[in-house]
Amino acid sequence: MFLINVWKADFGLDDAEAGRLSGIGIWPFAFSIILFSLFIDQIGYKAAMIFAFAGHIIWTVMAVSAYFVSDKATGYQLLYWGSLICALGNGAVEAFINPVVATMFSKEKTKWLNILHAGWPGGLVITGLLLIGIDSFAKDTPWAVKIGLIAVPAIIYFLMLIGLKFPESERVKAGISYKDMLSEFGVGGAAIVAVLLVLQLIDFFSGGGTLGIPVKLGFVALGVAMVVGFGVYTQSFGRPLLLFLIIIMIPLATTEIGTDGWITAIMEGIAKEQKFHAGWILVYTSAIMLVMRFFAGPIVHKLSPLGLLAISALLAILGLGYLSFAQGAAIFIAATLYGFGKTFFWPTMLGVVSEQCPRGGALTLNAISGIGMLAVGTLGFPYIGTLQTKAQQNAIVENTELQSQIPGLVAGGKVVPVTEKRIYEVIPYKVIDDAKVKELTSKLSVADAEAATKNLTETKDRSNQRALLDMAMFPTFMLICYIVLIFYFQSKGGYKPVDLVHAPTHAAADEY
């Protein structure tokens, strides 16, 4: 998250391509967490932990190597594939830790899942402070050193957990069969996963280019086969409530993970003008999350999980809207609103799923995380990148001084030197073509070209902030959905967790 702009410069990426690199570090998480959730009760939590450790160490080696290879293309491939391996490891971590906590604290799931997920912002705070410190006091430190730091926590958690005995899951204890677990997710859940997975596979094997129709149809057939197979086995569409929560999770993940992944890069131009490190915004909002998640218990008791989520969505809307134009100290006031807004999203949603769909065991609890990460990696990160390019072009159209400096830059209310691209073969976008801009400025005197280029760069940097207003549409959709759920549960007598009725034996849990 803190190195996106560094990698853009090193490997010559545009915003959407940088989003694609961020995405490969996200979406495999979904594949890993869902796959492990299907079999984790059989292979054991410790196996997932060992897999995660291996993934984090391999990523560290590949990423550090990417810095030292002389060929940029090879370095980029090491970074790209290493990010994929790291994401698989991240998914394995959450595949075992979520059900472990839900089992250990079955009467206070939302509270303890919030405390568990304080580790996410905690990691961002520690990493952010380390990297800002390095940038401040040892500016020439290679980014390979920064990436290498990931090996430290990986070794620590491996040594902490390798000798421990993990508990039996809540589902298995209750005697809920494997088929019943899958039935909670159903064909509906499988279809959502299949759509996102097919889009991602098409992009992954296209390498950012295009694939032939037969190959695309092959991936579509794979997705259809997955859904049909799931349906034949479970003979269930899935719980409607769970499917509704899954739909909410897609914009939720984009609001939290997508914005976190881009906010340092988006605010970099403004931060330079205000003379502070852009990383401070992410560190600050993450610090708010870290502290507040430890107090989720009494807040949930006061508001209910859905009330907390609705208020959080409202704060996120206000925070992102304010961040889109805030200047100076007001940036941190806006960031405070956004930080409080995003604090409880992810773990409280997991708590709601675990409390309302406990028969789904590790699958429903982890699959909703997986779908969120798959959505933000497949669509969220690149889409935010396209919002930036759109904001840049709008700012150029509004800058009449810049247009007078570079004749031919704008015509008919549109930026002329652009290149049309398509990410994931789904999202079309236009990016400002630096080579075409250079052709226009080459016709100017050296002094005029330098002044125009400086104006253009500053205009683009400042405009990125505006993209945050467009991102507010995600929590707006979420707020509407949470209000619908609040009224739904009120019609049922209020929000109450579902308790599993424990069977006298565990035999049913082992049936396929």
Q: What residue ranges belong to the model's regions?
A:
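Central cavity-lining transmembrane alpha-helices of secondary-active solute carriers
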Residues: R20-L38, V283-A296
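Extracytoplasmic gate region of multi-pass secondary transporters
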Residues: M1-N5, G188-K216, F230-V283, G377-K390
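C-terminal ends and interior cores of transmembrane alpha-helices
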Residues: A54-K72, L314-Q327
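Glycine-rich segments within core transmembrane alpha-helices of 12-TM secondary carriers
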Residues: E108-L131, D135, L365-Q388
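Low-complexity, proline/glycine-enriched hydrophobic segments characteristic of transmembrane helices
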Residues: P382-A472, H506-Y512
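C-terminal membrane-cytosol helix-exit motif in multi-pass small-molecule transporters
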Residues: I132, K146, A151-V172, G188-G208, ...
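Hydrophobic core of transmembrane alpha-helices in multi-pass small-molecule transporters
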Residues: A73-V93, A330-F344
